[in-house]
Amino acid sequence: MIQLVPIPFIAATVFLLIRAQFRSEQRRVYFYKPLSTLLVILVAALSFSAPNVKAGYTAGVLAGLVLSLGGDVALMFDSRKAFLIGLVLFLLAHVAYSITFALFNGFYLGDLVSGGVLLALAIVVYRYLEPGLGQIKGPVIAYIAIICFMVNRAASAFLGSAFTPAQAWLITVGAVLFWVSDLMLAINRFRRPFERHHISLAFYYGGQLLIALSPAYFG
């Protein structure tokens, strides 16, 4: 499948990005970070050539990825304003994914199970981060809520018939990896900085790649 061709290049650029982050080579970060996201966008765009493709779903995934690209660029700059811009863009990316998953799959009673688990996790995460949030508690609450909703919509793929089993796994694991990467970043920024937080990029790009692959697997 042509959608798989960019994957080795994504693996290489993400590795080089993480290495540049650890070495504080900012110019290389400015190059490899948007390049990695653009390659993931290419994976999703190539799904238009797949059999049984649903253009609306692919467009929704691409919208989430393009908004994520904007968030990636914003977060390369170390300022409060850039952070808030990145936060808003990633929040909108999660909204785009959530709407896309919901429109194509709907809602089910079983969603309450994953919803309850995610609500409990959201409360625990917020209470842990709260002492370091300062004046941005509101935006962080909104972000936690929407990313948990996005994971809930992704997990719902297992309950309906709109997605194939392969897609359900790609979407759900991708969403969870995205959630984990954001959690690592939040802990590092607001509560307990840790030296190897750049590893979160592996979770982030892994999650985005799995979501980007999902449009190519309609039955």
Stretch-by-stretch model annotation:
Residues 1-219:
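Polytopic alpha-helical membrane-helix bundles and their juxtamembrane interface segments
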